[in-house]
A protein has these predicted regions:
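Alpha-helical multipass membrane-protein architecture
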Residues: 1-567
Length: 567
């Protein structure tokens, strides 16, 4: 049982007015996110935007604490990644001519199953990633800094909102007006998207994550793009298309191997400890260990029963059969771990990649109609998208001192609302525009879903996937960040290069600060205080740049939806 102070804390942070504001905002943000993901082939995190809006409306209604605003924005932003999970997968089936075989109920069950699995998984992995590993989660940190600056005002507020304004204006010039290009320094290299992405957000991600982790990310990008694609084709080992398939397979294998290794090394021992009753007093440290019931043992039972129930629902309602349903349910827990690690270190949640991985695994063991494979990818993508959002929110809560149980309940509310809204918006769009409007060079590019449609035929290179899978497990046990390397191998080179440049700025920033402090003749205490203030300034400005671009991305989505409705 949780102690009274924790219950009081939860009641003070999860309020009726916060739930109402959060749900209304969730409906709007979820709808715009579905449209954005389909129209632009991308989906910016709405977390910072939701944090600012939540605090604004709560203050209009009277006094509001940062923790109440944090829980409210958790509800408000939850549906965005649910919408992204659907939009990044299901339209692939429309492109292949299966639109008439997918109903609103099918999409809702896909979204709901993914939402519940994501919630159950994050209750299990919260402590590992937020407390033990204490990953950066740059987007969650940005939300926390935004709330603090909004509350405190003063110099920190000016730095944050000034940098947000700069990034926001720049994003409008780039995305709405086309005054500045999206890509810089592009080179025509067959099979490699060599460019610098003209994005304050991605530069800030590199700055916030730091040089060392991003260096591994960039090393993976160099290996995949120049080692395999450029080097392999130059040596005559394979053509460009084959090399690209090898790179995708290797990247997926590395990330999958990492996810399995985390389960084997870190998560299963925790579960085994619960089963053996090693956590004798479930009332201690409940905010860090137990999010659902307040009891570690009861939580384990709830998670197990919940997962079993979802497997049954998937098997019956979506007609996948028992074996595929069990595979999807179990492996979704692995991919949510991968998602949490990726978001924690890079700020990027490649949810459709994880959906692809499990879809291809199921396809290798079961004979299913192609349209059913999209359901599998959708469930996993929704779960991973929601998990990334939850873990970012937990990070903001850790910074601000918010009760994680209140956040988890808020996420459940927002996730379920988001599942309803996202499915409805998807049906509305395909009904209004027709399935032929979705795909490359169409009104709705749905880039990620197009990739899923292409991959339905199978893993491009099974040997390279298997090799990457084994390497991912071994590398994690050796302390090598396989997830970062795998991301670098898989993601477009321009994203990795831009993030690396941001991390180089952070490296130079730290070295300049160290040199300045060393030559200033300060005492150890003065040097430590000045260095802390300097690091906070860098964090605030980088968070502002990240938040400014994400806020403008959401606002532009609102404008796009409005113009479409009017026109």
């Amino acid at each position: 049982m949780s102690n009274p102070s924790n219950r009081a804390s939860m009641r003070g942070q999860l309020t009726l007015r916060g739930v109402v504001i959060g749900v209304l905002g969730c409906v709007i943000i979820t709808a715009s996110s579905a449209y954005t993901a389909l129209k632009m082939g991308a989906l910016p995190w709405p977390i910072v935007f939701a944090a600012v809006i939540s605090l604004f409306f709560l203050k209009l209604m009277g006094n509001a604490s940062l923790n109440e605003a944090n829980v409210t924005h958790t509800i408000m932003s939850a549906g965005a990644m649910v919408a992204g999970g659907l939009a990044f997968t299901i339209p692939g089936a429309w492109m292949l001519g299966y639109a008439d075989q997918i109903s609103w109920l099918d999409m809702f069950i896909v979204a709901l199953a993914g939402t519940i699995l994501g919630l159950l998984a994050t209750a299990l992995i919260h402590r590992h990633f937020i407390v033990d590993a204490a990953l950066e989660f740059p987007t969650g940190n940005a939300a926390a800094q935004t709330l603090r600056a909004t509350e405190a005002g003063g110099k920190t507020g000016k730095q944050l909102f000034g940098s947000m304004a700069i990034a926001g204006i720049y994003s409008v010039l780039r995305d709405a007006l086309g005054v500045v290009p999206s890509m810089l320094c592009t080179l025509n290299i067959p099979g490699v998207t060599f460019a610098i992405y003209n994005s304050p957000m991605l530069l800030s991600v590199g700055f916030l994550v730091g040089f060392a982790p991003v260096a591994f990310w960039f090393a993976g990008a160099l290996l995949g793009n120049f080692g395999i694609i450029v080097g392999g084709t130059a040596a005559g080992l394979f053509d460009v298309m084959t090399a690209q398939g090898i790179v995708k397979s290797l990247g997926m294998g590395l990330m999958m191997g990492f996810g399995v290794a985390v389960v084997l090394k870190d998560i299963l021992p925790q579960v085994a400890g619960i089963v053996r009753g090693l956590a004798a007093d479930s009332s201690t440290d409940t905010d860090e260990q137990s999010l659902i019931s307040g009891s570690l043992k009861l939580d384990a039972g709830i998670i197990g029963l919940g997962a079993a129930a979802i497997a049954v629902i998937i098997a019956i309602v979506l007609d996948l059969g028992p074996v595929p349903a069990v595979i999807v349910t179990l492996f979704t827990f692995v991919t949510t771990i991968m998602s949490a690690q990726s978001c924690g270190q890079t700020g990027i949640d490649p949810m459709e990649i994880f959906g692809l991985i499990i879809m291809l695994i199921v396809a290798a063991f079961a004979q299913l109609a192609q349209v059913k494979l999209f359901f599998i990818a959708g469930i996993v993508a929704v779960a991973c998208g929601l998990a990334g959002d939850v873990m970012n929110d937990f990070k903001a809560g850790a910074v601000l001192g918010t009760n994680p149980r209140a956040q988890w309940v808020g996420q459940a509310i927002g996730g379920i609302v988001g599942a309803l809204v996202a499915a409805a918006v998807m049906v509305a769009l395909v009904t209004a525009y027709g399935p032929d409007a979705f795909g490359p060079d169409k009104s709705f590019v749905a880039a990620q879903a197009s990739v899923v449609a292409t991959m339905v035929s199978g893993i491009p290179s099974v040997p390279w996937f298997a090799g990457g899978f084994i390497a991912g497990i071994v590398m994690y046990w050796l302390g090598i960040p396989a997830m970062m390397i795998g991301l670098g191998v898989y993601l477009p080179f321009y994203m990795s290069l831009t993030a690396f440049l941001g991390s180089c700025v952070k490296l130079a920033y730290d070295k300049w600060a160290a040199h300045r402090d060393a030559t200033a003749g300060l005492s150890d205490e003065e040097r430590a205080a000045k260095d802390a203030a300097f690091q906070e300034q860098g964090l605030v400005v980088a968070s502002g740049l990240l938040g400014g671009e994400s806020i403008v991305g959401v606002i532009l989505a609102f404008v796009s939806v409005g113009l479409s409705l009017l026109g």
